[in-house]
Amino acid sequence: MTKTEKTQIIETLTAEFKASSAIAVCDYKGLTVRQFEALRRAARDNGAKVQVVKNTLAGIALENADAKGLELKETNVFVWSDDQIALSKTIMKFAETSNEKFKVKFGYYEGSVVDAAHIETVSKLPSRDELIGMLLSVWTAPARYFVTALDNLKKQKEEN
């Protein structure tokens, strides 16, 4: 790989990492090509990106993106996305189905280094759409109760 190719990879990764709110670093030793492609498909379906990069290049890109404190050792695959919950759900689900061949090592969520346990906890949260639905339900509840009370009052007056 030439120096210009390395520079291009670093620039691309830096821009991608800066734009994302969640980055996960995982071990993929033992995955078959078919399994790895399944990971890429699952990630793509949830708006995440997956790439295997040399640790030195990824380390430079992460530092350029102000993601400091990550120790990159051994083989790593990087998965990143704007949606922390979708990313966490995708990689944890894949880790469960990969028979110990795919392991989540750590991540970088919203400016801080997180461990695999934190990523697993985030994966158990409701999805973004479910959270929005819950919030809307809470917001509309008072109006719904008010309308129900007025309707009951109307029915009561009609009976009398």
From Swiss-Prot:
UniProt xrefs under InterPro entries: Ribosomal_uL10 (IPR001790), Ribosomal_uL10-like_sf (IPR043141), Ribosomal_uL10_bac (IPR022973), Ribosomal_uL10_bac_type (IPR047865)
Highest taxon of the lineage: Bacteria
Function in brief: Forms part of the ribosomal stalk, playing a central role in the interaction of the ribosome with GTP-bound translation factors.
Keywords: Ribonucleoprotein, Ribosomal protein, RNA-binding, rRNA-binding
Protein name, entry field: Large ribosomal subunit protein uL10
Keyword Ribonucleoprotein: yes
Pfam families per the UniProt record, alphabetical: Ribosomal_L10
Self-association and partners: Part of the ribosomal stalk of the 50S ribosomal subunit. The N-terminus interacts with L11 and the large rRNA to form the base of the stalk. The C-terminus forms an elongated spine to which L12 dimers bind in a sequential fashion forming a multimeric L10(L12)X complex.
Gene Ontology terms for molecular function: large ribosomal subunit rRNA binding
A GO biological-process term: translation
Organism: Wolinella succinogenes (strain ATCC 29543 / DSM 1740 / CCUG 13145 / JCM 31913 / LMG 7466 / NCTC 11488 / FDC 602W)
Coiled-coil regions listed: none
